[in-house]
Design a protein with these regions (language model features):
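Cytochrome P450 core scaffold surrounding the K-helix E-X-X-R motif
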Residues: 5, 76-81
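A long amphipathic alpha-helix within ATP-dependent nucleotide-binding catalytic cores
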Residues: 12-60, 108, 112
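Conserved metal-phosphate-binding beta-hairpin within the catalytic cores
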Residues: 44-77, 86
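Cysteine/selenocysteine-centered motifs that mediate thiol-based redox chemistry or coordinate metal-sulfur cofactors
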Residues: 96-113
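Catalytic phosphate/nucleotide-handling subdomain of diverse soluble enzymes
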Residues: 82-95
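Anionic-ligand binding region
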Residues: 1-17
Length: 113
């Protein structure tokens, strides 16, 4: 009964029916997982993303992954999609922030070397 793509109200309007939907871990085959990881890593490099990014995928009616968008600068807020995805990977919010900052620090140190 919901539209297939979330709009503005899904993130910012507490009266939206999307507001209380929970993010859950996707149950994907090993093959699909490998494809997604390889694709994200390749795109991360080709798009010259730095330190972190968020890749949003959807499966079509045949179960084929389709890239919805690449967000090279997703929000760091504690209740945002990036933090939710980190939590699903058993990464705490403080640990997520630390990983982002460490990545930037390593990149900057490498650039200066």
């Amino acid at each position: 009964s919901y539209p297939r793509i979330c709009g503005y109200e899904a993130k910012w309007d507490p009266s939206s029916p999307y507001w209380n939907l929970r993010s859950v871990r996707a149950h994907l085959s090993e093959e699909v997982q490998r494809f997604l990881v390889a694709s994200c890593l390749k795109l991360f490099g080709r798009l010259k993303c730095r330190d972190y990014a968020r890749f949003d995928w959807r499966l079509d009616h045949n179960g084929t992954p389709r890239l919805l968008e690449v967000n090279p600068n997703p929000g760091w807020c504690w209740d945002g999609h990036l933090a939710k995805m980190a939590a699903l990977a058993d990464i705490s919010y403080p640990e997520m922030l630390q990983k982002i900052l460490q990545s930037a620090e390593h990149r900057i140190c490498d650039e200066k070397a």
